[in-house]
């Protein structure tokens, strides 16, 4: 297993020969064909990336993200012309925005002041969460690894190599003990997170990470944090039944991907139920 402490996002995601958790989840939800499809970053993905980076590496956040703060220019416009109903449509505002955009470097991503404030509130909510605090207290660790990248050296019996990049690891003697995964959401209640859990196949994510890092699945914790007021946070893990089912399904998906790697074809890359009759 190769371990990288400072591998960039771009370099990590370029290693497409190694199967990732995202790939596994996409196969489970649809097919290998869908898992291979490239998607442009959405505003939600950009916000999630900014949030994770802020939580884990402030220096990287400052390098990669720049905040568009129009508070002062809006206040100035309204002070001079209080009759203006939409300051962003004025010449002064457009000039200010154009000058700002010219100052942004090619490798930087712009987020709004509102998004920046939301991330700060989310961070405080997570830090203050006593459930999360208890994890740090209950599990003996001597280090914390944020966004370390792990890549296997040799293919397994399915002929596959794997990669994982956990948000946060609690580590003891260089060995991962606990996996913590930040989840931005609109609703951190049990009902809402349970729906997200199955919709986005977080169970398979935990199985994949824990299997590769040899961490017990009941030591994988999701910290769900609302990205809107009141910015509640809650901590979740997996019960024994969910753990076992996720591990079994993970092995079936690995087998499916392995067969496709060995024999790429529409039959091996398409829907699992494409060439049979399915009774509902």
Model-derived features: positions:
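Hydrophobic/aromatic-lined pockets within catalytic cores
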Residues: 28, 55-60, 184-187, 214, ...
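Short acidic (Asp/Glu) and glycine-rich catalytic loops that position anionic groups and cofactors
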Residues: 30-32, 184-188, 228-232
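Metal-dependent nuclease catalytic regions and adjoining charged, substrate-binding loops involved
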Residues: 97, 195-203, 208-280
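Secondary-structure boundary elements
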Residues: 137-140, 170-177, 213-219
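Short histidine-centered catalytic/ligand-binding loop motif
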Residues: 39-40, 107-108, 191-200, 239
């Amino acid at each position: 297993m190769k371990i990288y402490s400072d591998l960039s996002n771009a370099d990590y995601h370029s290693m497409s020969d190694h199967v990732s958790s995202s790939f596994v989840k996409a196969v489970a939800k649809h097919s290998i064909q869908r898992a291979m499809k490239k998607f442009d970053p959405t505003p939600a993905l950009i916000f999630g990336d900014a949030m994770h980076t802020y939580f884990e590496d402030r220096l990287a956040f400052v390098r990669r993200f720049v905040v568009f703060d129009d508070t002062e220019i809006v206040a100035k416009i309204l002070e001079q012309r209080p009759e203006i109903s939409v300051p962003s449509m004025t010449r002064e505002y457009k000039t200010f925005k154009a000058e700002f955009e010219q100052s942004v470097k090619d490798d930087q991503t712009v987020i709004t002041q509102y998004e920046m404030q939301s991330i700060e509130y989310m961070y405080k909510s997570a830090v203050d969460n006593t459930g999360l605090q208890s994890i740090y207290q209950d599990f003996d660790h001597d280090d914390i690894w944020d966004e370390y990248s792990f890549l296997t050296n040799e293919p397994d019996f399915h002929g596959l190599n794997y990669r994982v990049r956990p948000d946060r690891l609690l580590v003891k003697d260089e060995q991962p003990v606990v996996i913590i995964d930040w989840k931005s959401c609109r609703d951190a209640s049990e009902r809402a997170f349970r729906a997200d859990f199955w919709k986005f196949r977080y169970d398979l994510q935990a199985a994949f990470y824990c299997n590769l890092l040899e961490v017990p699945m009941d030591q994988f914790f999701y910290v769900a944090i609302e990205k809107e007021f009141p910015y509640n946070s809650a901590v979740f893990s997996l019960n024994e039944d969910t753990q076992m089912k996720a591990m079994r399904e993970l092995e079936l998906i690995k087998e499916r991907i392995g067969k496709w790697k060995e024999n790429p074809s529409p039959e091996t890359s398409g829907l699992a139920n494409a060439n049979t009759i399915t009774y509902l």
